Amino acid sequence: ITMGMWIGGDRDGNPFVTAETLKLSATVQSEVILNYYIDKVYTLYRNFSLSTNLSKTSEAVAKMAALSSDKSVYRENEPYRRAFHYIQSKLIQTLLYLKEGNFSGEGHRLADKAEAVLHANSATSVSHNGREIIPNYIQSKLSGSLDELRKEQLPSYKDAQEFKEDLLVIRDSLLEHNGQALVTGELTELLQAVDIFGFFLASIDMRQDSSVHEACVAELLASANIVKDY
């Protein structure tokens, strides 16, 4: 199953639907789905308090947990929770990149003063103009400090497949260590959502008046010296 829509792409007879309209529509869609993922991963983070004293984990999960900036002594023996913390931090930076055009790539971390972003309330805030769709817990911590955050940033995802692969690392570890019951439910539902929505939520159908298509084809044919008067 994949989702599709025409909002932002219906230019057939509507001069007010422009390239900027399409860009806004696609951006808002991505903001919505990234916020959804952040909330779901935060829920998993809260629920997966498995201790290494009771349950083993794979080496891949241990490596992911080690990359988390969550260094609390209360969670040092909870690799699954710290792994979800790491995943959430990457999603947050992906959302910031989308809104600020500030891509960090791998290996960067958020400044300590914004660390509480990852532990606060996950309620969302949506404004009427469609440009402030960002969780309150991000918005409150980053307000007025984005210039500094550009220097010390969270890691980010290149695409939804990379996000899914991180989730699969956790799923596979659970399956390998008698955690089948924990795989069903929220984790499986999140994996299904990633398959359906990716980082774009839905494709956008493009509709355009036939005269515009004709003019575009004519220009292409003329520039390629195929037909000068299409």
Name each region found by the language model:
Residues 1-3, 180:
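Extended, Lys/Arg-enriched charged tracts that mediate electrostatic binding to polyanionic substrates
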Residues 3, 21, 25-26, 56-57:
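Trp/Phe/Arg-rich N-terminal binding region typifying the photolyase-homology
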Residues 3-17:
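Active-site and channel-lining beta-strand-loop segments
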Residues 6-8, 20-22, 204-209:
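An acidic- and aromatic-residue-enriched active-site/binding cleft used to recognize and process polar
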Residues 19-43, 219-221:
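Extended active-site and interfacial segments that coordinate phosphate-rich ligands
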Residues 41-48, 52:
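A generic secondary-structure signal for well-formed alpha-helical elements
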Residues 50-230:
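Extended, charge-enriched "interface" segments that sit outside catalytic cores
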